[in-house]
Curated annotation (Swiss-Prot):
Lineage: Bacteria, Pseudomonadati, Pseudomonadota, Gammaproteobacteria, Enterobacterales
Covalent S-S links between cysteines: none
Enzyme class per UniProt: hydrolase
Designated name of the protein: Peptidase E
Example GO BP: proteolysis
Gene3D superfamilies, alphabetized: 3.40.50.880
Gene Ontology molecular function: any one: serine-type peptidase activity
Catalytic activity of the protein: Dipeptidase E catalyzes the hydrolysis of dipeptides Asp-|-Xaa. It does not act on peptides with N-terminal Glu, Asn or Gln, nor does it cleave isoaspartyl peptides
């Protein structure tokens, strides 16, 4: 399988998806036809989100079609060489994808050679479940099981920083709480600016920041760019 799972879409001082464009270009391998799944968009319309994505990817020669615009979404997925899932609200993304019965066809198409690109919520959707999302508002997606293309749970936008005087939990504390009730999970705290690239059966960590791996009953493990999962 070919996956590009990004923690986020924007870095300080850079345009939207700018940091991701070289990564995407490097993994295209001649692919040009893409479907975009915009359902995580809540404060922007799906048309706006699709047009924005198409515009930024056009210089790479990628032709983007919004999945919500086609008469036969399953046929569009089958024909697609690239499946792109945008960030936003993970619950809304999973709900809409499940209601349209897109999860199994997307997973099957990626397993048969389509490149999967997802940032933030799109990276969450590639995991076994969406139980490590950060998102609100919460809508009922009728179950948390997701695409299960990547075997570990990703927590995107990972940071352990708290504003001065803030008394809420750190991100690590919240992940630790999850591991109490679901000790079978392994969670990757993926900071902004980092990504996981899967190609030829190898998953490789990229990005400038330390990534953390959390398991029940164990100390967190720090990983740097180049680590192979």
């Amino acid at each position: 399988m070919e996956l590009l799972l990004l923690s986020n879409s924007t870095l300080p001082g850079k345009a939207w998806l700018e940091h991701a464009l070289p990564l995407i270009a490097n993994q295209l391998n001649g692919r040009r036809s893409a479907v975009f799944i915009p359902f995580a968009g809540v404060t922007q319309t799906w048309d706006e989100y699709t047009d924005k994505t198409a515009e930024v990817l056009a210089p790479l020669g990628i032709n983007v079609t919004g999945i919500h615009r086609v008469a036969d979404p399953l046929a569009a997925i089958e024909k697609a060489e690239i499946i792109i899932v945008g960030g936003g609200n993970t619950f809304q993304l999973l709900k809409e994808s499940r209601e349209r019965e897109l999860l199994a066809p997307v997973a099957d198409r990626v397993k048969r050679g389509a490149l999967y690109i997802g940032w933030s919520a799109g990276a969450n959707l590639a995991c076994p479940t969406i139980r490590t999302t950060n998102d609100m508002p919460i809508v009922d997606p009728n179950g948390f099981d997701a695409l299960d293309l990547f075997p570990l749970q990703i927590n995107p936008h990972f940071t352990n920083a708290l504003p001065e005087g803030h008394k809420g939990e750190t991100r690590e504390q919240r992940i630790r709480e999850l591991l109490v009730v679901a000790p079978e999970l392994t969670v990757i705290g993926l900071p902004e600016g980092n990504w996981i690239q899967v190609s030829n059966g190898q998953a490789v960590l990229g990005g400038p920041n330390t990534t953390w791996v959390f398991k029940a009953g164990e100390e967190a493990v720090a990983l740097e760019a180049g680590h192979r999962f």
